[in-house]
Amino acid sequence: MCIRVSSKGMIIGMNRLGEAFSANRAFVPEMLMAARCMSAATELLKPLMVGEGTEPVGRVCLGTVKGDMHDIGKNLVRIMMEGSGIEVFDLGVDTSAEQFVSTAVENHCGVIACSSLLTTTMEEMREVVKLVHERGPQDQIKVMVGRAPISQSFCDEIGADYYAEDAGAAAREAVAILKAQKAS
């Protein structure tokens, strides 16, 4: 029953709102309000979902890069991802490349999702990509980047695997990545 409430109601609603946000038909206040509702509902349902055999789509390691203390966008991404059935390891703000990679490796995360609001901290994303290539199983861990100053060209320049323009796109892309990883 709880899975049906989540998958047939809450997740569909958040996905539709994410699509509206991507198309500039919904705005940050609506996203924040829906995110708070989703978070509260998820917390209420969690105890009831234990034992229902819910298997997450996959795991994502999420955080704001070192030097950046902004978390509103990251929190929206977390809620959208959780609402899409992803298990999220939220590292918070000011997260080093080492923290991202070690958490992803230890917890078998298929995606590292990095956020940066400041142009002065964007370069830390390059360090995350570099460390994944040095230490992580790069065929198993994909790096996604996003937030206001980030673009597809920056993503390509630093060698990240995916760029997400907003929270809805991040959740949709992560689901697609994780499902493809499970299928292979």
Predicted regions and their residues:
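Short, small-residue-biased leader/transition segments that mark boundaries at the very start
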Residues: M1-I3
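A charged, well-structured terminal subsegment
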Residues: A171-S184
